[in-house]
Design a protein with these regions (language model features):
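Conserved alpha/beta-hydrolase catalytic His-Asp/Glu region
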Residues: 129-134, 147-204
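Active-site glycine-rich loops that stabilize anionic/oxyanionic intermediates
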Residues: 30-34, 97
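Flexible "cap/lid" loop of the alpha/beta hydrolase fold
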Residues: 104-109, 113-147
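Post-His helix in hydrolase/transferase enzymes
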Residues: 255-269
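The conserved beta1-alpha1 loop
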Residues: 28-30, 214
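Gly/Ala-rich beta-loop-alpha elbow adjacent to hydrolase catalytic centers
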Residues: 95, 99, 103
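Active-site loop/oxyanion-hole signature of alpha/beta-hydrolase fold enzymes
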Residues: 3-17, 36, 40-46, 52-94, ...
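Conserved loop-alpha-helix segment in the C-terminal half of the alpha/beta-hydrolase fold
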Residues: 43, 207-249, 260
């Protein structure tokens, strides 16, 4: 996509957009997605905002992590290494879906590195114990991917992430391209993380301004479930008392409503926390 440079640092492939904002925007994609899911949103950001969208470990050209069942903390550590290698000290994290689990873990583990959080279509995680089997939802996705292959898996599921898919075929196609590029190793690792993670615990320790948004027609993380995630954020760190609900939008918020997503990013970047 025009204006985005492909980079590879610390074993991570990413798309980068130049800018001079002191705290760059770092974009973390979801379970069945990739770095380019933020492409249209990044293109819509105002000119001063530097932005970077990674392929999380095991996705695209990024190295997989070195363990079969990584935690959200392991992904956060990989993100910290990317920031270190890129010379980035403090950033604004934008997470979508599964990416919100990594964003929340990063904010808890490395609070000095995170200026603010924007959580789009956040997922709670399943909170399963390490000794427990994978939850049925996660196991079902991994088994379907293994049985069908990436292309068929994408074709069968992409439309479910888009509001009114028959009228938004371009968005469905964009979502499907990301799913079709999934790698078995990275998808399995991310599934294990989704199974064990619990965003409520990390958000309870957030120490930065946080904004939560969801599509009004999101079938994967519907607004009524996202409302419980908002409640986990300490009230004095919420940019808005409640969540932002984006109209006529499904789960693929950054792809279906990139202009609205870009405005949310600007709101978070510009937010000035009140003095204690």
């Amino acid at each position: 996509m025009s204006g985005l440079a492909q980079i590879h640092r610390a074993g991570i492939a990413a798309l980068e957009r130049p800018g001079n904002e002191p705290a760059p925007v770092i974009c973390l994609h979801g379970f069945g997605s990739h770095a380019l899911s933020y492409g249209a949103m990044m293109a819509a950001l105002r000119p001063d905002l530097r932005a970077l969208s990674w392929d999380m470990p095991g996705y695209g050209g990024s190295d997989a992590l070195g363990m079969a069942e990584p935690s959200a903390s392991d992904y956060a550590a990989a993100l910290r290494r990317l920031l270190d290698t890129s010379g980035l000290q403090q950033v604004v994290l934008v997470g979508h879906s599964l990416g919100t689990l990594i964003a929340a873990a990063m904010a808890r583990l490395y609070p000095e590195r995170v200026k603010a959080l924007l959580l789009l279509s956040p997922t709670a995680g399943f909170g399963a114990a390490p000794s427990d089997p994978l939850p049925d939802v996660v196991a079902g996705r991994l088994n379907a991917f293994a049985a069908e292959g990436a292309a068929a898996y994408a074709k069968a599921r992409a439309a479910n992430l888009v509001y009114d898919p028959s009228r938004h075929g371009d968005v469905v196609a964009s979502v499907a391209r990301g799913m079709a590029a999934l790698r078995a190793d990275g998808f399995a690792q991310a599934g294990a993380m989704l199974a064990r993670a619990r965003i409520f615990d990390d958000l309870a320790e957030v120490q930065c301004p946080t904004l939560v948004a969801v599509g009004a027609q999101d079938k994967v993380t519907p607004p009524e479930k996202v409302a419980m995630i908002v409640d986990a954020v300490p009230s004095h760190w919420r940019i808005e008392a409640s969540m932002v609900v984006v109209p006529e939008c499904g789960h693929a918020l950054t792809q279906q409503r990139p202009l609205e997503a870009a405005k949310l990013v600007a709101d978070v970047v510009d937010f000035q926390a009140p003095s204690p």
